[in-house]
Amino acid sequence: MSVIAGVFGALPPYRYSQRELTDSFVSIPDFEGYEDIVRQLHASAKVNSRHLVLPLEKYPKLTDFGEANKIFIEKAVDLGVQALAGALDESGLRPEDLDVLITATVTGLAVPSLDARIAGRLGLRADVRRVPLFGLGCVAGAAGVARLHDYLRGAPDGVAALVSVELCSLTYPGYKPTLPGLVGSALFADGAAAVVAAGVKRAQDIGADGPDILDSRSHLYPDSLRTMGYDVGSAGFELVLSRDLAAVVEQYLGNDVTTFLASHGLSTTDVGAWVTHPGGPKIINAITETLDLSPQALELTWRSLGEIGNLSSASVLHVLRDTIAKPPPSGSPGLMIAMGPGFCSELVLLRWH
């Protein structure tokens, strides 16, 4: 067992309403002829506002992938440092207490990786174990928490952290309209989050009162590589998004969840908190229907989507933070759910104190 000691979400300073973002997209010359579908997709996304790492007027001038990636490195490190410092502060721990740092991103490239840059800025120990995760996309928030637990099960005195940074707005330089890209333009935004967790002995020493991490389950689905992802080229990241995505969720997720819960003597009716990635209205509805949940079960997921959009891997960690702030009764199980490129799911079983 391991224990979540602190969760902190960080958002860039530029916040825009969905209407402002829609108007900006339809004003791009290459979007001529797409105005109706852009407005329709943006209106149906259930997103009210989003945060961006740059002022809106800067994006039309950003046409080079290399230039965008330089900005990504600078801003991602800034947000990652802010998120990790906040999570450590919530945990009552110092940077030098960290034994393991996992970083997750899919919206930019950095060598040395983000973890090395964040470690230097915050003053982590020279012997900190660094684990950069790239390519997991939306599933990486839950997968990263699961990997924290994997380490801490064997290190009861240890402390480990996950930092997720996604700057989706920087994946569009030189962008030409595609249907998946238009869907993404309605949903994705920028942000970061960090989770600090401790092994069971260290958690007792510091009085960590976040939920316990009990177990996790991964499932990589067959013949699904093109369900979701990016094609990376000279113009940046081109979104791959199958129209069958919701159907894949409905096909697999119900059995994944019921089997995993049953292995712990639980069913969906026992779960007091659903910590679910806000992938978009169709995905949230598919999860609700396939698990036969009440309309209120994913309230915090819907709220996160509306307030900040889809932050890829960081989103489920924002929902985790919101759930900790509004916890279920003591002793209640919780289930973290995220899905992403592969195509795959990651489930993390939690228990509230």
Curated annotation (Swiss-Prot):
Pathway linked to the protein: Lipid metabolism; fatty acid biosynthesis
GO cellular component: plasma membrane; polyketide synthase complex
Catalytic machinery residues: 138
GO biological process annotation, one example: polyketide biosynthetic process
This protein's record includes keyword Transferase: yes
GO-annotated molecular function: acyltransferase activity, transferring groups other than amino-acyl groups
EC number: 2.3.1.-
Enzyme type, top EC level: transferase
Keyword Lipid metabolism among UniProt keywords: yes
The entry's keywords: Acyltransferase, Fatty acid metabolism, Lipid metabolism, Transferase
Gene disruption phenotype: Abolishes the production of phthiocerol dimycocerosate (DIM) on the cell envelope.
Similarity annotation: Belongs to the thiolase-like superfamily. Chalcone/stilbene synthases family.
Subunit description: Homodimer.
PANTHER family, per database record: 1,3,6,8-TETRAHYDROXYNAPHTHALENE SYNTHASE, HYDROXYMETHYLGLUTARYL-COA SYNTHASE
Function, in words: Could catalyze the elongation of hydroxybenzoyl-CoA as well as elongation of the aliphatic precursor involved in the synthesis of phthiocerol dimycocerosate (DIM).
Descriptive protein name: Polyketide synthase-like Pks10
Organism: Mycobacterium tuberculosis (strain ATCC 25618 / H37Rv)
Organism lineage string: Bacteria, Bacillati, Actinomycetota, Actinomycetes, Mycobacteriales
